[in-house]
From Swiss-Prot:
Keywords carried by this UniProt record: ATP-binding, Ligase, Nucleotide-binding, Purine biosynthesis
Protein name: Phosphoribosylaminoimidazole-succinocarboxamide synthase
NCBIfam families given in the database record: purC
Domain of life, per lineage: Bacteria
The keyword S-adenosyl-L-methionine is annotated on this UniProt entry: no
Stated family: Belongs to the SAICAR synthetase family.
Species, as recorded: Sinorhizobium medicae (strain WSM419) (Ensifer medicae)
Signal peptide segment: none
One Pfam family per UniProt: SAICAR_synt
Catalytic reaction list: 5-amino-1-(5-phospho-D-ribosyl)imidazole-4-carboxylate + L-aspartate + ATP = (2S)-2-[5-amino-1-(5-phospho-beta-D-ribosyl)imidazole-4-carboxamido]succinate + ADP + phosphate + 2 H(+)
Organism placement in taxonomy: Bacteria, Pseudomonadati, Pseudomonadota, Alphaproteobacteria, Hyphomicrobiales
């Protein structure tokens, strides 16, 4: 690992130079962060679960024609991805009031929204990722109007797919965050899904009990994060049904 050239290190992942031009290796760390790194811990086994859950989701998105950077999983913690030019925005899709939306607008957590809402946040840790409007995005050149249309169309399709996927295993998709990038292929450029989709980037509640099965368990000091992520993976059929929840080294289905 040390011999490879490190391209970028974020809060939960490291990007290394890939084996072929136009590819990168995405490594999933066990680091858990919240509130823009103000809260930090290392949780054994988290990266392995996020790698597998994100692989599962991106593979299904690719199959239904939603373009992503995912090529294939390499091992327990790494996947091969296409190199993209990341658009400096976090795109949040909300179906149920929770988190900052509840605080900002005084809406009780758990309130189903009249329709899905798409929000944009400028990726800048020093500024705590401020919420921005479409006007800000186009005025400052972070994305063009056409790119924004493409991003929103992707976000809506991803929301439709994920909502159905999770509903089928007894999980409510409250909200989720995605990132997109520009993929250059010869003279052509298109917007594709990048980063990851995992319980780190989604709010997932058990439909029956409303039990939180996502990173809010870390944000709110609830404990049981790995067990919750394992339960998500188990329901999706990613890890062995008979494997008891435990803090490290989950047995994975090949």
């Amino acid at each position: 690992m040390n011999r490879r050239r490190r391209i970028y290190e974020g809060k939960a992942k490291i990007l290394y130079e890939g084996p072929e031009p136009g590819t990168l290796i995405q490594f999933f760390k066990d680091d858990a962060t919240a509130f823009n790194k103000k809260k930090h811990d290392v949780i054994d086994g988290k990266g392995v679960l996020n790698n597998r859950i994100s692989e599962y989701i991106f593979t299904h998105l690719n199959k239904i024609g939603i373009p992503t950077h995912f090529i294939r999983r390499l091992n327990m913690r790494e996947q091969l991805i296409k190199e993209v030019e990341i658009i400096p925005l976090e795109i949040v899709v909300r179906n149920v009031a929770a988190g900052s939306l509840s605080k900002r607008l005084g809406i009780e957590e758990g309130t189903v929204l009249p329709r899905s809402i798409i929000e944009f946040y400028y990726k800048a840790d020093a500024l705590d990722d401020p919420m921005v409007s479409e006007e800000h995005i186009t005025a400052f050149g972070w994305a063009s109007p056409q790119e924004l249309d493409d991003i929103m169309a992707l976000a809506i399709r991803i929301n439709d797919f994920l909502s159905g996927l999770f509903l089928g295993v007894g999980i409510q998709l409250v909200d989720f965050k995605i990132e997109c990038g520009r993929l250059y292929e010869g003279d052509m450029m298109r917007i594709i899904l990048a980063d990851e989709i995992s319980p780190d980037s989604c709010r997932l509640w058990d439909i029956e009990t409303k039990e939180k099965m996502d990173k809010d368990r870390f944000r709110r000091d609830m404990g049981g994060l790995v067990e919750a992520y394992q339960e998500v993976a188990r329901r999706l059929g990613i890890i062995n049904e008979n494997e008891p929840p435990r803090g490290s080294g989950p047995v994975l289905v090949k």
